[in-house]
Regions:
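Second-shell loop/turn segments in exported
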Residues: 142-145, 177-181
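Short beta-strand/loop motif that positions the catalytic acidic residue
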Residues: 158, 168, 173-180
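Structural recognition of the beta-strand scaffold that forms the well-ordered cores
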Residues: 12-17, 22, 171-176, 204-207
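Short glycine-enriched nucleophile-adjacent loop
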Residues: 1-6
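C-terminal catalytic histidine-bearing segment of alpha/beta-hydrolase fold enzymes
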Residues: 28, 155-156, 182, 189-190, ...
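Accessory cap/linker subdomain of secreted extracellular hydrolases
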Residues: 17-165
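Solvent-exposed, acidic/flexible segments
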Residues: 147-151, 165, 181-184, 217, ...
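Extracellular/periplasmic catalytic domains that process cell-envelope and extracellular macromolecules
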Residues: 7-8, 164-168
Length: 259
């Protein structure tokens, strides 16, 4: 949004938590090596499939791809997003669209996990790996990477939707976990570097060491609030205490449930 707001005097700035970018590069280049490395450690420590970061992350990427495909179809009705998936995963991808185009599943559903698009893929990955004990997570027949990499409609979408290609003259605070497997840190690092190269004067990247996707955002809640109060205040006069802003002891930051 910030890229389109350079001429909008009412737009004051933006906070971005692990901004989605370079989906093609993540899926085709970064994820296979990263998830294979994580999986090797999980196997070494006998982590069950349902608790593996590698499984959850690959399911998340497949859900992203499905929602991306449905989004493309919304403006290009002739596009068949099912084609970017292998036969086993085609019906799962269709949950992103739903039966009417308006009742598709969201990435997550806290009240009913069975209605989570991520869980649809995750459950099937687990089923596949349970039935094929010699297979690794990247062996799951999910995305058809050759079609994804060469389909002209997909390629055009990834180029046109890529953020960080225009100078931004408003302050931007970017929070990024260095252990994020959904949006890897090097991807966001390159995004921020490019924005600075384009002459964006106030872009701050805050790497949260060892933090995952959502974890990083929770851990930097106080910093995000301070940034918003500094640059994007609504002028309500409400002032939060440090204790109210700080979420560093929250279990979603520490990873430790309260006892």
């Amino acid at each position: 949004t910030a890229e389109y707001a350079n001429t909008d005097a009412t737009y004051k700035g933006a906070v971005a938590g692990a901004p989605a970018s370079s989906l093609g590069k993540i899926i085709l280049e970064v994820a296979p090596a990263a998830l294979s490395s994580i999986e090797a450690q999980e196997i070494q420590y006998n982590i069950p499939l349902a608790a593996r970061t590698s499984v959850d992350s690959y399911a998340t990427l497949l859900a992203y791809a499905a929602l991306t495909g449905v989004g493309i179809k919304a403006y290009e009705p002739r596009f068949s997003y099912q084609d970017i998936f292998q036969s086993r995963a085609k019906s799962l991808a269709e949950f992103a669209e739903g039966s009417t185009g308006d009742n598709g599943l969201c990435l997550d559903n806290d009240s009913d996990p069975s209605l989570s698009l991520i869980n649809k893929f995750k459950d099937d990955i687990i089923q596949f790996m349970t039935a094929n004990l010699d297979k690794k997570v990247m062996d799951y027949p999910g995305l058809d990477t050759s079609v994804f990499a060469t389909n002209e409609t997909v390629k055009n979408f990834l180029i046109s939707s890529q953020p960080g290609t225009k100078r931004i003259d408003k302050p931007v605070y970017v929070i990024q976990g260095t252990a994020d497997t959904n949006v890897p840190y090097p991807i966001t690092q390159a995004l921020v570097a490019n924005l600075k190269t384009l002459g964006s004067p106030n872009i701050t990247l805050d790497p949260v060491i060892g933090a995952s996707h959502t974890q990083a955002i929770v851990c930097r809640n106080a910093e995000a609030v301070d940034f918003i109060q500094t640059y994007m205040s609504a002028g309500t006069g409400i002032v939060l205490t440090d204790a109210q802003k700080d979420a560093s002891t929250n279990e979603n930051c520490t990873g430790i449930a309260p006892t």
